[in-house]
């Protein structure tokens, strides 16, 4: 997109690559108990098994879909108008909110009145902000603790189940071997859940709306869903649900435009970003955020201290509670779903970082540390935490309690500063829960593999099982340019141990601002890590997709292999580098082993030989060995023969 502001406002359009359905996929909707609960999923169509392999039908599989209306050909996408307000009716029906006469943030009013920002502003439908009525609490946690199952909770239950039961039933009716096929495709290894809900190897265990309600009421899961972001499709973050991933986007003082950030958001959700954080620190933060929220079907998070710092020209010591409070209200009225707030960075912890290799690496943490030292006072975020809770519950903004003292190197992992802050975050969680405000806890950082589980165990203990949300962790410091891999290793491990959401790392980590390609690379890496964690935990149905892809691979259904994978485009591109012809898409080999050494083709030959001889596969292998032994002796018992 052109960075010219007038062009952006007048002619902004969505990136065409972000709206095309993925190959052999279509958007389907599952309706809940009322017509306006329509839960999106991605249906991946599969080819029939070739006759030589049995000839059965392979029904579609269903996968979790974060792309919103963008990949629905029936949806009219116009980013100048924004997305439909999916949750508006549910919010209004609860009767506990009020529409304000206008913005109540001083900064928001100033931006709205500034003619210099007119060409930058989101031009779509203008809705006055909504807030809880006096004395009311509008958080999903509050409803859950009242025993209320909201439409959001029902939506989430349907979404988490991914039509597993329907898929298994379709397998059973696929032919004479349907029951056997269903048993095979639904098979799943028992997991090790480390104290999370034990589903065993039951692929059909169902996530119910009541289960969702109970997890939210206990504080073990959150539903980030600001009442001013009705465009969002409800999702849940908790260790007893699918592991989620977050994608960071945002401009900087030196690069990127509003249009580029909207593009990154739509690109991130296409590939599986469950939430997106706008970490903009450059120009027009307010306007950039409005464009992103109005066009985002996933929850949006921010770090409000970044914008507050811009309001005081980058001087941390000039920050005040009043400026920060106004920033919270400004962003809550725009519709931000969760705030990273570094309230655990206390004055007493700052000296503990003096002997670190890399000091304080969190931007938010360093801002608050500098403020504490400049004033030699306790952090205003800590001192005013109860007042922050009052703001959060008026809009249903969730806390993401920031790890401002996270280790920025392997050397600093699990040190006194990091763990001291974590204990404080546990104390703040209890305060937030008194207000029925939803909380997740942010975690490291750079941690070697042998120390990762300790991080998880301490967080579960000190923070009373509030969802953990971690950046990686990176398991080594030696690979600039590959930190999506160094962190993906740690992410898979900590996700298995109980982390509920993983914040992606791109190849540009520590090096520069990521572009769209970097965003995709980070997303795919972290989708892989999250899925590996789901498998290891034994989450219901986690293995269905693996089984479907493995069956397609064994039957040489190349197109299905590509399409079931996390990145069909890259899989197809790699295959076609060496075997580009269409005929190669039905060949019983790839370029790795060629036609004579494909292990799966050899296995198929053994099975075919066994069927012809009327013997078991083991006996067939034995007979085959005997035949080859005779041939070997007849040819002179030489290992090599001159051609």
Curated annotation (Swiss-Prot):
Protein source organism:
Burkholderia ambifaria (strain MC40-6)
Instruction: List the PANTHER family hit by this protein, alphabetically.
Output: PHOSPHOMETHYLPYRIMIDINE SYNTHASE, CHLOROPLASTIC (PTHR30557:SF1), THIAMINE BIOSYNTHESIS PROTEIN THIC (PTHR30557)
In its UniProt record, which GO terms are filed under biological process?
thiamine biosynthetic process; thiamine diphosphate biosynthetic process
What EC number(s) has UniProt assigned to this enzyme? 4.1.99.17
Q: Which domain of life is it from?
A: Bacteria
Q: Which UniProt keywords apply?
A: 4Fe-4S, Iron, Iron-sulfur, Lyase, Metal-binding, S-adenosyl-L-methionine, Thiamine biosynthesis, Zinc
Binding residues annotated for [4Fe-4S] cluster, in chain numbering: 590, 593, 598
Q: Which cofactor does it need?
A: [4Fe-4S] cluster
The record's function comment reads: Catalyzes the synthesis of the hydroxymethylpyrimidine phosphate (HMP-P) moiety of thiamine from aminoimidazole ribotide (AIR) in a radical S-adenosyl-L-methionine (SAM)-dependent reaction.
Identification of the protein by name: Phosphomethylpyrimidine synthase
Which residues bind Zn(2+) per the record?
Answer: 446, 510
Q: Name the GO cellular-component terms.
A: cytosol
Q: Which reactions fall under this protein's catalytic activity?
A: 5-amino-1-(5-phospho-beta-D-ribosyl)imidazole + S-adenosyl-L-methionine = 4-amino-2-methyl-5-(phosphooxymethyl)pyrimidine + CO + 5'-deoxyadenosine + formate + L-methionine + 3 H(+)
Tell me the name of the encoding gene: thiC
Query: Which family does the UniProt entry place this protein in?
Result: Belongs to the ThiC family.
HAMAP family linked to this entry: ThiC (MF_00089)
Q: What quaternary structure, including any partners, is listed in this protein's UniProt entry?
A: Homodimer.
Q: Name one Pfam family in it.
A: ThiC-associated
- Show the NCBIfam families listed in the entry: PRK09284.1, PRK13352.1, thiC
This entry's comment on the bound cofactor is:
Binds 1 [4Fe-4S] cluster per subunit. The cluster is coordinated with 3 cysteines and an exchangeable S-adenosyl-L-methionine.
The record's annotation in Gene3D superfamilies points to: 6.10.250.620, Radical SAM ThiC family, central domain
The pathway noted for it is: Cofactor biosynthesis; thiamine diphosphate biosynthesis
Q: Where does substrate bind?
A: 248, 277, 306, 342, 362-364, 403-406, 442, 469
Q: Example GO molecular function term?
A: zinc ion binding
